[in-house]
Amino acid sequence: AKHVAVGDLQFADDAERDVARQFFRGLPYVEVVESASYPPCIGMSGMMILNESGKSIFSSRYCVETEGYPQMMGMALKEGRMARERNEAVVNETFARIMRWGDEILGRVVHNSHTSLGDLKVVGVLKDFHTASFYVPQQPLIVRCGKFGNSIHIRLKEPFVENLSKLNSQASEAFPGKTVDFYPLEQEMQEAYSIVRVFRDATILAAVVMLFVMLMGLIG
């Protein structure tokens, strides 16, 4: 997440997407530009995985990403390649383990609840990494390749803060009809953990209060 800026931008068609991507790539302080439907720290969306009879087996985390996104974010492929076609998918090790595929993973077919997609062919396996936060147990994940847009991730050169300001300024000028607000991915990760910390502290406080009430009852 270091030196990565994130911002949400939607594009009307492929031509607009191509223009936008070339714009970002052409900025002198930009190293890499990719996109995903959600950053990993958000927890991603969900997809219900079905068996051959159409019965739900489990819910998997689900994300749509550009082909180079995993490499940009340091997500390592254990085998195979990133999905490129609409009906292709990459799964993580936990997903394959839940499906009991053993070592024969590539070429497997995933039946899912997204009827508009149809079955997905597994072309790659990602090594496990945490989505949401480290407080959340390892989750199954399935990834498809998607078009540029939604949550845009841009790795900036140093000085990061200065270049982030330039990015927001120049992108706002380039896309006057859109709301441009790039921010550090690390900031979003810190906010996600702060929510967990507040909940944890509130839980501990509630437990202490309950214990105090019980002790008062015993004494009284």
Walk through the language-model features, giving the residues of each.
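Short, basic, helix/turn surface patches
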Residues: 59-66, 104, 206-210
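"Rare, low-scoring activations can occur
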Residues: 14-32, 93-97, 114-200
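Structured, solvent-exposed hinge/loop segments at the ends of secondary-structure elements
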Residues: 1-97, 114-118, 191
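Hydrophobic alpha-helical transmembrane segments of multi-pass inner-membrane transport and secretion
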Residues: 197-220
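Short conserved beta-strand and strand-loop elements enriched in small hydrophobics
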Residues: 104-117
